[in-house]
């Protein structure tokens, strides 16, 4: 039976996600940015929280873990590295591990760069990937703890997923990401179409997430750092993908 995925806002621009297994009643929250919105979504749906799947240790992703665990007695799953900074961890996971949420299966991808401990959760049967702050719609996360080559390698892992997978990321940054992408890749017709769609969605106060990975592969310039055409646009003909990615990330940092 397919997962029921709910998308909502936490804090100022974080996404909250609930993944519900109708067969067993199990429900997971991907990260725990803020308790109030998560609890309200659970109560509105008549669900009980059984699991929290943590992607990385930043406070805006784990700030509500202790409160939710106290209220629901849920299992807390977190990446191996730096989990001492996360309260009440029950299960620590790494690359290739598979977690069960009821009868739903989530595969762990290690996707470091934004932080060293960052992981993404892939629900293959539901064609969904929760990439938090590694891959955004039309963008990617800042590289705080890792290196640019490390982050590029993480993006390649996500890019390798099928085109019909849906991307669920950590923040509503799509409008800003589109604005930057157009400065580099302004003649990309798919990107221009996505920009128009994002403008319409945000004007209606609607979410831009999920997006399809196939669309990201066409419109997200960070996923195309190994495309010679992108290097040429940056006046970096002959540069490595890692060098091109680093230049893109530096430019976005300053935008």
Swiss-Prot record:
InterPro entries: Clx_II_MBL (IPR035680), Glyoxalase_II_hydrolase (IPR050110), HAGH_C (IPR032282), Hydroxyacylglutathione_Hdrlase (IPR017782), Metallo-B-lactamas (IPR001279), RibonucZ/Hydroxyglut_hydro (IPR036866)
A single GO molecular function term of this UniProt record: metal ion binding
Binding site for Zn(2+) 2: 60-61, 133, 171
SMART domains in the record: Lactamase_B (SM00849)
GO biological process per UniProt: methylglyoxal catabolic process to D-lactate via S-lactoyl-glutathione
Catalytic activity: an S-(2-hydroxyacyl)glutathione + H2O = a 2-hydroxy carboxylate + glutathione + H(+)
Cofactor stoichiometry and binding remark: Binds 2 Zn(2+) ions per subunit.
Biological or metabolic pathway of the protein: Secondary metabolite metabolism; methylglyoxal degradation; (R)-lactate from methylglyoxal: step 2/2
Alphabetically ordered keywords of this record: Hydrolase, Metal-binding, Zinc
Alphabetical list of Gene3D superfamilies matching this protein: Ribonuclease Z/Hydroxyacylglutathione hydrolase-like
Amino-acid positions noted as binding Zn(2+) 1 in the UniProt annotation, renumbered to this chain: 56, 58, 114, 133
Needed co-factor(s): Zn(2+)
Annotated EC: 3.1.2.6
Family to which the UniProt record says this protein belongs: Belongs to the metallo-beta-lactamase superfamily. Glyoxalase II family.
Family annotation (PANTHER family): HYDROXYACYLGLUTATHIONE HYDROLASE (PTHR43705), HYDROXYACYLGLUTATHIONE HYDROLASE GLOB (PTHR43705:SF1)
Subunit structure: Monomer.
Physiological role: Thiolesterase that catalyzes the hydrolysis of S-D-lactoyl-glutathione to form glutathione and D-lactic acid.
Protein name per Swiss-Prot or TrEMBL: Hydroxyacylglutathione hydrolase
Organism, scientific name: Bradyrhizobium sp. (strain BTAi1 / ATCC BAA-1182)
